[in-house]
Amino acid sequence: MDRSNWAAFAAADPGLAATVEKRFGAFTHHVLATLRKDGSPRTTGLEVRFLHGELWLGMMPNSVKALDLRRDPRFALQANPGPGTDMADGDVRIGGRAIEVDDDAEAVRRYVDEVNPPDPSAFHLFRTELTEVVRTYVEDDAYLVVQVWKPGEPVRTVRRT
């Protein structure tokens, strides 16, 4: 697997990256899926940030989602669909690995300066390595369109009737 951060994805497909970032920017809270100790899935709410070419996941100290990611870094992140059934710009989700940032004081400082967490001295910060980005939307009221990006591959688009 190629290591791929947000900047690498945005360089590979700027249009899809802008749409995905817009969807995540439409609402504050999104859904993060992690794996529990026994391997079963856990879903929790989360705020995300796109800063300095990275997708960041910040968490309260010793939150169960942070402990899950320390044990198994795989995650899935689903954008908040918002109210109703409109879902302008479609449904988007991101899969990847979350890498805790505990040895890069400059990255933590820049995140704190931008985000201003409640306690800047006590939180978990993870950068992400993307394994896939998926957008699903309806086109012309006729097609369900699924766009899938994976590192090192072009975007694959499937239209279903």
How would you name each of these model-derived features?
Residues 29, 74, 130:
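ATP/adenylate-binding site constellation spanning eukaryotic-like Ser/Thr protein kinases
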Residues 24, 69, 110-112:
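A generic structural signal for nonpolar/aromatic side chains embedded in well-ordered alpha-helices
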Residues 1-15, 86-161:
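Charged, gly/pro-rich active-site loop segments
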Residues 62, 73-81, 106-117:
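Short acidic (Asp/Glu) patches
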Residues 7-36:
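Short, conserved active-site entrance elements at the starts or edges of catalytic domains
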Residues 27-61, 69, 77-81, 90:
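Short beta-strand segments
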